[in-house]
């Protein structure tokens, strides 16, 4: 006698379709394509969790560079002078200051230039 799976198969398929809820077209309806789409989405999620860190670092660097150039110094020179003068501040905080607290950022730039000279 042939065993078709019954409730077990239905539950397993429903679980995959629930994960594919909101997907476009047959990816949310068909079991096989839904499963493939969900697995692919997990791959993208894993990859992009790593990529997000790189993207934010790029964003911080470009913001610091723009603010530093307004002060007449390039990003690389500024970071070198900050390291030389033992100012312990990370790029995230520098970028935040460059956007929201320009006067404090200017003070750090002046301090780094003065200490390293």
From Swiss-Prot:
GO terms for biological process: ribosomal large subunit assembly; translation. Transmembrane segments: none annotated. The keyword 4Fe-4S does not apply. GO terms for molecular function: rRNA binding; structural constituent of ribosome. Keywords: Ribonucleoprotein, Ribosomal protein, RNA-binding, rRNA-binding. Binds directly to 23S ribosomal RNA and is necessary for the in vitro assembly process of the 50S ribosomal subunit. It is not involved in the protein synthesizing functions of that subunit. This is Large ribosomal subunit protein bL20. The gene is rplT.
